[in-house]
């Protein structure tokens, strides 16, 4: 039965029962949430629930979601959200990337929203907070956890107004100054928030979750990572990335001794260079009929009072300053009078300021009706003592300022010029009316008579209430009204005492007496244009602000300093300079200045660069052996060396700006931030987010600038690609590694990333790139443009302990940045041997690289023909040592190709292979993701080589795997035979090596490697036999020597070129036709072909000398990297 029907009939259960059930369930849920929060926080007091704000509504912010449970704290998994509680992504957010989300204003919280948006777009901090990579003390990281939840919600598009309200409650709980809905300074809140995060994470090593760096990363960054302070476990995240040091040096002018003091800073407060004057126009009022008004331009001091302006006007008019009255006159009449003690900044540039001169008392001097220029002359030559013997104001004679208005009250409009009269307060209304008509007689029609017109107007005292400020025409003495007395008693020092009166005319009377009146044009003097040009919109550069910050200042005499060396008070020279630079540089522009009780906001346009801010000129210059300053901070962050050595340590890129709009008494905060996904700028005005052009970022309201060091920008950030290196797609962003992303949110992010974006380029996974490898000379500094340091590696890209245990201690993470400039065109591909030549030695691994290369080849069929000239280049210095230690490369000289006339065709094929890099029939290329085009060695399983008579075959272990019934002898056995006469101590060593290699297990030998060695060594043995029969004996050489004499090398090279090698004619010709050349390795287009591929390192009999070509470093083939034999470090 329907409950409503049952209740109506008096049957069924009562209606309040379901409501009591819901209330009981809600109470139980609150109890469970409170119990869970107390168990997580330990002994900390329970957090008060979020109080509903009167500003929380559906109209502002565009959110209509009901309040949900509190977000999970950073670093701990929160409760699962019900399917229906997740906020849906609005269609308007589809065009914006993640992170471009507004924040609701909870009542004058624009300062908080702007700072949170700037911190949310800080790449390092956003990844650190959103992924929960911090370890905070229990119960004391509530502000940090709420900030992390808010940042995570902004990037996952799960923001609700409740999250920002809870963050504000946490801020109010730990910062009493931010309670309520009062306005606050954004810089004050930023410094408080960073200090609070530092305190929350203090005591933990860097504030990070305990995680061990890979050995190669820890070895590289050992010198770059700041050392820990001696009194703590290590610097927090805020100290490591936001904090740096500045040096204050005090130099004695007598002995030139310098005393240095080092202090930390979170932001650099830069003074804005001030113009000492500003433009202001004042209209001078003359009593003459020919010229009534004249506007003059003045350059008034910025920090001054109205007394200075009164003095300048008096000097411009040639009158005493005590006779000048300054008032503000608008189209609706008088507004206010200016007195000497008022701040000059109360007068804006566009205010209409009028200056009146009070005529002197009768007998003391008169004013001329014809001013010459701006001066009022001639005056009677009276002395000052005579002129000011009597006061300008007495009880009976008062100075009155009049202005004519059409209408009454605030709707009145002014017509005609204002005028000044000095009258006795005892006059009647008729006398006062005739005095006023005499002043406006020049504006009246000629046929109108001013006699017997009755009451034409009403008079009102300006500055008082309209109800009680009108003078009565029925009074015998209307100027003795109490309103006039009150206006005279409200005066302050500055100019003669006066009373402002408004004469209000009726519209019909005005039309009958004056007709159609037009506003009189005010003439401008030449000084107006001249001062306007001199005071155009003031602007300066950020570099000028830094120069003003670091300029030298001499102490005043009252602030003299006692030099410890001279023991005398000296006016030392103080200079501030930056000692170290942080990863995140926060610059505060001092727009609010206060001198005494006067405060003002500077609207100077500070031109700051969006990218490439060079901080090298503002860092203290010091040599490489200089020591850091005393104290614990010197050991925390070591000083950087010369700026010319590491230029990337001094380049910064802008990513956020906090703006202030308004005045010092009240204003509004907004934020301009660059998104790390698309690299575009967005304007954040509370809940409103709009796209912004780069030329709109620099405004007069810029208050706080956020810069990030270029070599500390994460590689996944779009700001990285803007600076010259290659950025990755959304899959490399830390946002995709957020474990709380569900499938729908992840799909929406991926669908957004599928839109075309020019800044999303693919990052190569291999550390070898198509550009030329930078070689490093011994003792020099390797120069690589735009190389990112260890600090630029993303925090979440470090290998987990589980992956390290699975891959072994030498597992290296793939590099995610490019060593080349983004705009540089990729050149020809390079081989692996050139990569090894750059001294970047690969880590040894237990897995063979042959299966990897075979799979990477994409299943291409390779020819199974042997190589008759398969060689690897020999190195210059350590060739003998490498061969003696068991290197896998077997170098041969390219001059061996001249042994037979039938090899002439091979030279042509080599030349053709060098010019044609796309020969797919002979060179099998690897996929582009390896970027290492190499030639895969063919197998010799189908070849049946001819053996010379008398040569016995040595059985090869594991030869059945190759598929050949007869195999050539092992390399060690062949070397034993060749060096049997080299000396008494050589044969046992070679025998022991041969025995060790024969006892080696089959699993350690790669099939492709030994296939290559069998064919190469068999052909070498055959050629050695023929060469030995025809070559004359030579003095023996020692295998222990690493080099041969130049005479022996030249003699052997000449002998090899002249030997015909007649016994191998048919055999070598047949092998050359059937085997592809292994020398068809692609060369860089910019490098010319070498004269000889490599030097010879064959093992010969003692009577044979070894020939060497151009000495070069050995180049190892890819197939030799799968072996376990360690390579000497000097060979690279």
Swiss-Prot record:
Residues 1-103, 839-891, 935-1008, 1024-1044, 1057-1106 are annotated as: Disordered. Residues 17-28 have a biased composition (Basic residues). It catalyses: Thiol-dependent hydrolysis of ester, thioester, amide, peptide and isopeptide bonds formed by the C-terminal Gly of ubiquitin (a 76-residue protein attached to proteins as an intracellular targeting signal). The modification Asymmetric dimethylarginine is found at residue 746. One of its GO terms (molecular function) is cysteine-type deubiquitinase activity. Gene3D superfamilies: Cysteine proteinases. GO terms for biological process: protein deubiquitination; proteolysis. The modification Phosphoserine is found at residue 970. The active site is at 110 (nucleophile), 668 (proton acceptor). Pfam families: UCH. Residues 29-44, 63-78, 958-967 have a biased composition (Low complexity). PROSITE patterns: USP_1, USP_2, USP_3. The keyword Phosphoprotein applies. Its EC number is 3.4.19.12. Residues 101-710 form the USP domain. CDD domains: Peptidase_C19R. The keyword Hydrolase applies. It is an enzyme of class 3 (hydrolase). Keywords: Hydrolase, Methylation, Phosphoprotein, Protease, Thiol protease, Ubl conjugation pathway. Belongs to the peptidase C19 family. May recognize and hydrolyze the peptide bond at the C-terminal Gly of ubiquitin. Involved in the processing of poly-ubiquitin precursors as well as that of ubiquitinated proteins. This is Ubiquitin carboxyl-terminal hydrolase 43.
